[in-house]
A protein has these predicted regions:
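Positively charged, small/polar-rich N-terminal and surface patches that mediate targeting and assembly
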Residues: 1-96
Length: 96
């Protein structure tokens, strides 16, 4: 099993949920309006630092995680200017 943590900054978070559904991620949790700091600066949802992110956590079987990771990488390369997706894949020993 693998845990995927996906962070998307952009106006179309359904891009990510569509990929999760297409790759049969049997469950995921979505957190909207996330704020933070990254390589392109701060996102705080304010006038000074506009923007926010959406992030997801999903536990998937390893072969499916690899396929999903590849699709997310492809999606990332085709995003419009200003939109970003970052993904971390972590080993999961148990999940209940």
């Amino acid at each position: 099993m693998k845990m995927l943590v996906i962070v998307y900054s952009g106006s179309h978070p359904q891009r990510i949920t569509s990929l999760l559904d297409r790759h049969h991620a049997e469950g995921y949790t979505e957190f909207q309006n996330a704020h933070g700091v990254g390589s392109t600066g701060k996102r705080d949802g304010s006038r000074a630092w506009p923007g926010d992110s959406t992030f997801w956590v999903s536990i998937v079987p390893e072969p499916r995680a690899e396929e999903l990771m590849q699709s997310l990488r492809e999606e990332s390369s085709g995003l419009p200017v200003g939109e970003r997706v970052h993904v971390a894949m972590l080993p999961t020993e148990s999940f209940f």
